[in-house]
A protein has these predicted regions:
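Conserved NTP phosphate-binding and transfer environment spanning the P-loop NTPase/kinase superfamily
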Residues: 2-189
Length: 189
């Protein structure tokens, strides 16, 4: 299915740390998102503030076939990519992440497992590679893959505004630096 899940014992992973805590901070963290609107790039590198922003907003999409009644893609924001399971204010976890990124020199990437047909633009403030092994370069600038660039602009503006509205409504303790790392519509409505 489009929204399949699997679970298995941690002991099945050869290099798993069974004590529940690693000895060091990871070198790389990957956030997965599914942009059903097709405007986020397939891969982008996040600086500390952008990583905190995307962690605290937890954007993904609901698509037809994954939930009853969903006919069109719908944005969904679940702070920390698992909001119901996090009892503290998202900023607490966001700051913890920021501290770990700084102290460990961790690189953070946002991987879009959703649709292509749209890509990076100034609204989303994401660093997108110009080349990636085994990935056609035209996919990295997916705005050019849309048949209608004006439609891309319309959809991108709408999604950027959804990010802003979500942060203003639900993430009131987000620092100005982290908020500034998030998307912004280019046009004033």
């Amino acid at each position: 299915t489009e929204n399949g899940r699997v679970a298995y014992p941690v002991e099945f992973i050869d290099n798993a740390v069974l004590k529940g805590k690693a000895k060091r901070i990871p070198d790389v963290v990957i956030f997965l998102t599914a942009d059903a609107f097709g405007v986020l790039p397939p891969i982008s590198k996040l600086d500390k503030d952008a990583a905190m922003y995307h962690f605290m907003t937890g954007f993904t999409s609901k698509v037809a076939g994954t939930e009853r009644g969903i006919k069109e893609p719908q944005p969904t924001f679940s702070s920390l990519f698992g909001e119901p399971f996090m009892p503290l204010d998202p900023m607490v976890y966001g700051e913890m992440l920021g501290e770990k990124i700084e102290s460990g020199g961790t690189r953070v990437y946002l991987i879009n497992t959703g649709w292509t047909g749209g890509s990076y633009d100034e609204r989303f403030k994401l660093d997108v590679p110009t080349s990636c092994p085994d990935v056609p370069s035209e996919l990295l600038d997916a705005r050019s893959t849309w048949a209608n660039p004006e439609e891309y602009d319309r959809v991108a503006e709408s999604l950027a505004q959804m990010f802003v509205d979500n942060a203003e409504k639900r993430l009131t303790t987000m620092s100005p630096e982290v908020r500034a790392a998030g998307p912004r519509p280019l046009r004033v409505a």
